[in-house]
Structure formats: C-alpha cells, structure tokens
C-alpha cells in the first residue's frame, strides 16, 4: 500500500514560515486529541450539558469546556503564540510573549449535535500579532484577509483536517496511529452546484433576495434555474461547509427578521473568517449577502456576528442577482 504524505511532510513543502507551521502543528495535535475525546464521549461520561452558559449566552456542553481547555493549553505552550481568543471565553488570553501570532477558534462547532452523534468540528484562524508589546483585544480585530492561515477539523466517520496556509487548500485524514495523512491535495469547490444548505424553518423571516433564490431552487427544472436541487442541512457549520469543500454547494445562514437589529448568527472571528479564507482559496465565494465579501469586513468587537452566504461561486452570484 502506498504511504501517504503526512502533515509534517506537507508543511515542509509549504513556503510559509517555520513559526506559523509550528502553530499549525500544535493545533493539529490538539485536534487529534479532541477527536479521541469526542469519540469516547458516551463512554467517558463527557456528553450532556455542563450546567452553565458561555459568553454567547448559549448552554455549554461538557465537551465545549473540555475541548476549549485542550486548545488553550496547547496554544499557551506554543512559543510563537502571543495571544488567543475562544468563542467560549469572554475575553482574550495572552501568553506573555511578544510578536508571532494570534489564534482565534471555535473549539467544538455544532456541539448541540454531539449528544446524537452528528458530525462536529473545530475551526481556527491564525493572525499576525503586533511585533512588540503584549496583544490587546484591538489587535484581534483584523479583517479576514490578514489571516496567515486557517483551518478546521471535522469529527465524523473519519476525522479530517482541512488547511490553507500560503495558497490552496489541502485535506488530511487522521489514521489509526494518530498521524495526519494527506488525502486531498488540492481541494477545489466547483463553480456550479445543485445543492443548497439552509434552515428552511426560518423561510418566512428571510430577506427577499434569499427567498427568491431558494424559491428558484425549489421550483426545479420547471423554474427559472432549469434544474433540480437537493437540500442539505446538518446544523453544524463545519459539517455543512466541509461537504461544500468536498463536492460543492451553497451554505446560507442569512439575516432574518426575528431579531432585525442583529446582523447574523455566526461569529466573524471564530467561524466566518476562517471558513471564508478556505472557501475563497478553494475557488468559491464567501459573502455576507451574496455581494459583500466577508474577508473585507472590519471587525468591531471580539464576538461580532454576521450573516453568511458561501460556497460555489456561481450560486453565490445568483443570490446577489436575486
């Protein structure tokens, strides 16, 4: 059997700097550890609610706390990391070091699904830290285009790690010995698709462009799109976006009228920015509304939320045209 390139071998061929490679290696190790914890959840008694809420006012699962602590510990011990911010924590944490990188992460995306054994994941973003001085919250408020690397791990039938550093997107599968093996050397999202992912139960609350787009998809061959579409919805961003990375599609978590003063649901720094970098580098588009690129958004606060429309480029354009 052919031996597949491992993560270290792939990183050695990447033109990115050694320090960012070190950070990626540490995060990959933490994700491998999280994979084991997630897989043994019911056996180890780590499923279920933790009996508290996070900064997002969401009920925390036990695994939210466990996975958050795994990543925090790994990153604090990583020399090039000057600071970190987690979806689960109200404030940033610093390491006492200057220069290097800042890391933002969602330790367990889709954790509401964990008790029913649906795929969940970890999402992360690596940003440049200021050259001197201990980082402050303001240093994390960088547009997504300033990310030096981003990635996610998805814990499903296989555990996969999808990364972008200097260019392109690559996917790795965790083998039985705990090594990340390169299984998807050039992830590319096709421009056209016949699948959409959206929570249809909120249809009555959407803005007109989103309604028109989905109505066109639902009309199938007899409608304006002239082809049939399938709907997919896991309610785990990492799982839905991973499917799109592997075979195309469009993922939509749009603004809706239930809370009109809130711009969206997904977190810009922990979810939308890293996923947008991956999607764009794989040939797709990632926007707020079909028009405005998420990577161009200037963050104004640590836990800022945004609407998301991303995936196959021509489908995202169709939303804008609606």
Swiss-Prot record:
> Does this UniProt record's set of keywords contain Magnesium?
yes
Name used for this protein in its record:
Fructose-1,6-bisphosphatase class 1
Q: Which organism is it from?
A: Caulobacter sp. (strain K31)
- Tell me the keywords, alphabetical order: Carbohydrate metabolism, Cytoplasm, Hydrolase, Magnesium, Metal-binding
InterPro entries the UniProt entry points to: FBPase_C_dom (IPR044015), FBPase_class-1 (IPR000146), FBPase_N (IPR033391), FBPtase (IPR028343), Fructose_bisphosphatase_AS (IPR020548)
The cellular location(s) given in this protein's UniProt record come to:
Cytoplasm
Gene Ontology biological process: fructose 1,6-bisphosphate metabolic process; fructose 6-phosphate metabolic process; fructose metabolic process; gluconeogenesis; sucrose biosynthetic process
As to how many cofactors bind and how, the note says: Binds 2 magnesium ions per subunit.
The residues the record assigns to binding substrate are 109-112, 199, 265
Q: Which GO terms describe its cellular component?
A: cytosol
Q: What is its EC number?
A: 3.1.3.11
Which residues does the annotation say bind Mg(2+) 1? Answer: 87, 106, 108
């Amino acid at each position: 059997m052919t031996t597949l390139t491992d993560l270290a071998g792939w990183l050695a061929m990447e033109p990115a700097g050694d320090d960012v490679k070190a950070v990626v290696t540490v995060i990959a190790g933490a994700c491998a550890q999280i994979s084991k914890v997630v897989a043994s959840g019911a056996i180890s008694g780590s499923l279920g609610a933790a009996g508290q809420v996070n900064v997002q006012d969401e009920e925390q699962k036990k695994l939210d706390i466990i996975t958050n602590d795994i990543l925090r510990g790994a990153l604090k011990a990583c020399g090039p990391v000057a600071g970190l911010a987690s979806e689960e924590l109200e404030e940033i944490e610093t390491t006492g070091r200057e220069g290097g990188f800042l890391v933002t992460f969602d330790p367990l995306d889709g954790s509401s699904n964990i008790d029913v054994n649906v795929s969940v994941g970890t999402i992360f973003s690596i940003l440049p830290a200021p050259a001197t001085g201990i980082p402050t919250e303001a240093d994390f408020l960088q547009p997504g285009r300033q990310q030096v690397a981003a990635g996610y791990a998805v814990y499903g039938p296989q555990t996969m790690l999808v990364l972008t550093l200097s260019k392109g997107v690559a996917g790795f599968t965790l083998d039985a010995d705990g090594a990340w093996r390169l299984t998807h050397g050039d992830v590319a999202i096709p421009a056209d698709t016949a699948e959409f992912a959206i929570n249809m139960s909120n249809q009555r609350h959407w803005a007109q462009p989103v309604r028109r787009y989905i109505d066109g998809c639902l009309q199938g061959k007899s409608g304006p799109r002239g082809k049939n579409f399938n709907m997919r919805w896991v309610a785990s961003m990492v799982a839905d976006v991973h499917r799109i990375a592997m075979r195309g599609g469009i993922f939509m978590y749009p603004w809706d009228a239930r809370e009109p003063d809130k711009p969206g649901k997904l977190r810009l720094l922990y979810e939308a920015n890293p996923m947008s970098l991956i999607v764009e580098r794989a040939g797709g588009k990632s926007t707020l509304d079909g028009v405005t690129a998420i990577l161009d958004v200037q963050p104004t606060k640590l836990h800022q939320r945004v609407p998301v429309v991303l995936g196959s480029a021509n489908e995202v354009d169709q939303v804008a045209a609606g």
